[in-house]
């Protein structure tokens, strides 16, 4: 019985640790990813095909290419926070 209580206590402690907020260091979001923008040097035009991405700047972009254009124009390190709308 004591082992079972110990396992339950350990599981609850693990849940508390997992549920804690992840600190954001140096202004960087913990789950963002870098867009692939290398092709923008050769051809700075984007298709209008909709594949929404949410930028770390809080804006929704039509696609990853549009986010790359915004990175170039604003000279900001905009990354992809998630696929879809912000």
Swiss-Prot record:
Domain Kazal-like: start-end pairs: 31-86
Disulfide bonds: 37-68, 46-65, 54-86
Key word Secreted present: yes
SMART domains: KAZAL (SM00280)
One cellular-component annotation, GO: extracellular region
One function term, GO molecular function aspect: serine-type endopeptidase inhibitor activity
GO term, biological process aspect, one: response to xenobiotic stimulus
UniProt site positions, description: Reactive bond: 48-49
UniProt xrefs under Pfam families: Kazal_1
Major location category of this protein: secreted
InterPro entries, sorted: Kazal_dom, Kazal_dom_sf, Spink4-like
Subcellular compartments: Secreted
PROSITE patterns recorded: KAZAL_1 (PS00282), KAZAL_2 (PS51465)
Signal sequence segment: 1-26
Membrane spanning stretches: none
Keywords: Disulfide bond, Protease inhibitor, Secreted, Serine protease inhibitor, Signal
Record carries keyword Secreted: yes
Protein name: Serine protease inhibitor Kazal-type 4
Organism: Homo sapiens
Gene assigned in the entry: SPINK4
């Amino acid at each position: 019985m004591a082992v079972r209580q110990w396992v339950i206590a350990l599981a609850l402690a693990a849940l508390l640790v997992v549920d804690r907020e992840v600190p954001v260091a140096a202004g960087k979001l913990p789950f963002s990813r870098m867009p692939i923008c290398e092709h923008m040097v050769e051809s700075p035009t984007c298709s209008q095909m909709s594949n929404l991405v949410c930028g770390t700047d809080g804006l929704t972009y039509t696609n990853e290419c549009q986010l790359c254009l915004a990175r170039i124009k604003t000279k900001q390190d905009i990354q992809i926070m998630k696929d879809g709308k912000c």
